[in-house]
């Protein structure tokens, strides 16, 4: 089997596990939601707390903690005819300093699938294990009056049957108001916009290049203290992928969250996406002092889709 053909098959298997290869979309490690909390709310991850580096770095200015750490794992259902189970694993830390500044670092790994190679006669040869990983950095700056801006960068390593290295970056801005009221109830509001995964194509050799999944994302989140110990929240976000230019995809998701005593939360939502990317979402979480534990399940809406679950652990202080 020619190397170029092996690369294409490995690419399809790795990306197909997340259904992120809709109409040619690539490198799902740069676009998959790593946050279990917002995954349960229709994957409305643009304006969110927790997993700041990969959601919204500016959101850290809305909390009274200086240091944050998160880790998560997403496990996807097995693909028919492919060995192994696809997983996305993430760890990130962030630090707020000098009132207006915050810095972040993180790491992501995606892999777990096995592909059997064959020669021109159809005889089995070596086994291929495609995977991706990234090292990520971010910086956020509080401009003032609730406005802030941020930028993140990614060092990317991708292995299909050949290796490719590259980089990408994201720029965004947000507004948040933690002192507003709605019907005499204390409320928090946040809106965020960004252009993400900007960068050159990854070159795997043998004539195969993968475009970055460059996209625009806009979203907002609102939470209201309905009564003593009772809080209700809502989130909505949309993403439009315009790269590769021949593989445009539109995704919109939203969800609701109920929290009791600022400790126990239940969540539900729906995510609509072109080309079999839609999901019903649900989950729950527990928060005690600075510790956060969340879980989510994304249920595919059609057989051609892919269901998956995400669990996350975080700590702020």
Regions found by a protein language model. Give the residues of each.
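N-terminal secretory signal peptides that target proteins for export/translocation
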Residues: 1-2
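Sec-dependent N-terminal signal peptides
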Residues: 5-14
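Sec/Tat signal peptide C-region and signal peptidase I cleavage site
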Residues: 17-22
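Subset of outer-membrane beta-barrel
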Residues: 23-317
């Amino acid at each position: 089997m020619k190397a170029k053909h092996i690369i294409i098959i490995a690419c399809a298997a790795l990306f197909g596990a997340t259904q992120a290869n809709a109409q040619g979309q690539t490198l799902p490690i740069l676009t998959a939601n790593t946050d279990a909390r917002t995954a349960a709310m229709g994957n409305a991850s643009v304006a969110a707390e927790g997993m700041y580096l990969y959601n919204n770095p500016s959101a850290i200015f809305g909390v009274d903690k200086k240091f944050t750490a998160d880790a998560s794992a997403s496990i996807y259902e097995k693909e028919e005819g492919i060995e192994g189970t696809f997983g996305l694993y993430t760890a990130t830390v962030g630090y707020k300093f000098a009132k207006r500044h915050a810095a972040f670092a993180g790491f992501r790994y995606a892999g777990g699938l096995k592909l059997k190679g064959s020669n021109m006669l159809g005889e089995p040869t070596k086994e291929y294990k495609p995977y991706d990983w990234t090292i990520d950095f971010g910086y956020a700056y509080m401009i003032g009056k609730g406005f802030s801006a941020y930028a993140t960068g990614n060092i990317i390593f991708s292995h299909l049957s050949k290796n490719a290295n590259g980089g990408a970056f994201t720029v965004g801005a947000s507004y948040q108001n933690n002192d507003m009221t709605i019907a005499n109830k204390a409320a928090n509001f946040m809106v965020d916009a960004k252009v993400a995964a900007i960068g050159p194509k990854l070159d795997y050799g043998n004539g195969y290049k993968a475009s970055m999944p460059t996209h625009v994302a806009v979203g907002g989140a609102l939470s209201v203290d309905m009564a003593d110990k009772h809080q209700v929240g809502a989130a909505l976000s949309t993403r439009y992928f315009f790269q590769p230019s021949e593989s445009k995809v539109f995704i919109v998701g939203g969800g609701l969250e109920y929290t009791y005593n600022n400790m126990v939360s239940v969540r539900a939502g729906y995510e609509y996406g072109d080309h079999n990317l839609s999901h019903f979402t649900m989950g729950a979480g527990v928060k005690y002092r600075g510790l956060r534990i969340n879980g989510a399940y994304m249920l595919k809406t059609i057989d051609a889709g892919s269901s998956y679950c995400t669990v996350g652990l975080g700590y702020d202080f």
